Every structure is written in structure tokens, then in C-alpha cells.
């Protein structure tokens, strides 16, 4: 039974928990599980898990991401840990990008791929390829404030429309 669930999940490129009945149980205890490993962020965890539950209950827009969250605060308060534990609890990949590496205007092509006529055009971008491979994932854009404004514009498209087309039209 679990082998079948695993195979179906891989074929459909969805989390294994989505195929089994354990997703409902996992969502019920998501806030409690996160609070057991991340301390002092109860309000943020409550808001985060509330949005995820609403979306997974079918009350969100299926064309958009489950949620887009901005965790701000000083070093060491649990921003990165929340995303790591969330991915683990949901049974999905964590895609982490250090956005301080994307300070220059041309760096956006590293995320979505080079435009036609440029070196590396045949290859996709780091972000777009990863999301194609793992469409159900938690994406962590660490130190986003350091990224170039063109990166923000790309991310606004993702948050607003729920889509991003790479250089290969995928």
C-alpha cells in the first residue's frame, strides 16, 4: 500500500502525504509540531499554518502558490528554521537560495535562465529547474533584501499570478 502511494506520488510529482490519508493528520498537528522545534514564534506559526490549512482545504486559488510569506527579524529568531521544519513536516523539498548572490542585474538569469542568444540559453535557471523538478516545495529566499530589484519583479509575478516562465518557455 505504501509502495503504491510512493509510486503514485513520484509519477504525479506530488508529496507522498498528499496521496495518503496522513496529510490531513499532518495538517491538524502542523502548528504544534512547528512550535515544538521553533520557540518564541507562536503567532507567526499560527498565521502560517492557518493559511496552509485554508489552501489545502480548497479555499485558496489553485493557480497561485499555497502562500507567500515574508519572515523578517534579526539573526537567530527562527526564520530559516521555520521554513526547514515546514518542508520537513509537509514532506516536501526545501529549495534554498542565498539571495546575496543575486545583487547584480544580470543575476536574474541565473534564477530563470539566460535569454535567447546568450551563453547558457539551452539550460534553464536554478529556480525554474528546481521548481519544475519539485513543484510542491518550500522555497526559501534567504537575505532577499540583498537581491537586485529585477529579482523582486520576477518574484512579484510569481506571487501575483502563480506562474513563472523560464527561458525555454516552460
Indicate residue ranges for each PLM-predicted region:
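AAA+ P-loop NTPase nucleotide-binding core of proteostasis motors
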Residues: 1-170
Amino acid at each position: 500500500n505504501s509502495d503504491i502511494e510512493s509510486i503514485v506520488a513520484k509519477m504525479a510529482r506530488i508529496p507522498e502525504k498528499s496521496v495518503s490519508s496522513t496529510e490531513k493528520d499532518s495538517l491538524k498537528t502542523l502548528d504544534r509540531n512547528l512550535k515544538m522545534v521553533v520557540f518564541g514564534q507562536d503567532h507567526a506559526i499560527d498565521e502560517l499554518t492557518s493559511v496552509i490549512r485554508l489552501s489545502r482545504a480548497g479555499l485558496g486559488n489553485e493557480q497561485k502558490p499555497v502562500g507567500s510569506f515574508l519572515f523578517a527579524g534579526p539573526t537567530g529568531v527562527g526564520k530559516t528554521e521555520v521554513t526547514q521544519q515546514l518542508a520537513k513536516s509537509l514532506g516536501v523539498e526545501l529549495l534554498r537560495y542565498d539571495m546575496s548572490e543575486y545583487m547584480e542585474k544580470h543575476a536574474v538569469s541565473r534564477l530563470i535562465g539566460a535569454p535567447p542568444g546568450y551563453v547558457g540559453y539551452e539550460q534553464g535557471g536554478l529556480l525554474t529547474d528546481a521548481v519544475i523538478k519539485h513543484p510542491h516545495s518550500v522555497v526559501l529566499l534567504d537575505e532577499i533584501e540583498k537581491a537586485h530589484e529585477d529579482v523582486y519583479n520576477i518574484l512579484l509575478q510569481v506571487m501575483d499570478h502563480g506562474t513563472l516562465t523560464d527561458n525555454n518557455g516552460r
